[in-house]
Each structure stands twice: as C-alpha cells, then as structure tokens.
Amino acid sequence: MVKKFSFITIIISILIVLQFDKVDAESMSTKDAKVYFIAPSDGQTVHNPVKIVFGISGMKILPAGINEEHSGHHHLLIDLPVLPNLNQPIPSDKQHMHFGKGQTETIINLTEGEHTLQLLFADYIHIPHKPPLFSDKIKIIVKDHND
C-alpha cells in the first residue's frame, strides 16, 4: 500500500511540475521581419533551370531542428491557390519545398507556362511563426529555350 501511494504521489508531482513548466510552443517573429524574393522578379520570363533566391530581414536563418528565438528556414510554395494551415507543420511535397538546411537559394525545373511562387518562413519544426512571415506571391513565365 505504501509503495503504491508513493508511486502515485511521484506521478502526480511530476504532472504538476510539467503543468507549471509549460513553455509557449509558438515561435514568434520579430516586428520588423520581412520575407521576399531577390530573384526572379514578379512577371519575369525565365528559362529552365530556374534560379530562385530567397530574402529575409529581421530573422535568423538556421537549419531545421535548431530551436532558437527569432529563427527558422525558408519554404517555397509553388502554384498554391492559398497558404497552407499556418498552425501546422508545412507539408512536404512538390508544391511545398523545404529548405531545412538553411539554404537561401535553389535551382528548379518547372513546366512551361505561368507559375506562382511564394515564400513562407517557419520554425525549427516547420511551423510558421506568429505572426506568419510570407512573401508576396509572384508570377513567373517559364519558356522553352527555343522561344
């Protein structure tokens, strides 16, 4: 009986400590932070492979998995009509490209035609900051090298 009581007391104590030791899991962005494209520019006609250069100010770029205040890494959103859920980790597929090593540029191939691009900056576990940091959406036109 005493062992059972002691075990229950320990468990309750741990739960109480954990409850009071909760840390706000939301990663905050700075007031002056801004995410933007350095290249290409909105409306630009490009050829494959397409070089895309990311810009950010007011935040620190770090690889995924490193939890530091006011930091994160870029995600490139391709041809998305709306932003993904900003309270969940950003999906990883061909329309949601992760740059979790802290990259600030990429070279990709896109099909010919018009495409939209948007940047979304997120924390160490791919969840957008509060408030979220996303670029303006830009349109580019990909042409064949023979055009």
How would you describe each model-predicted region?
Residues 50-54, 104, 113-121:
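Short, well-structured beta-strand segments within conserved domains
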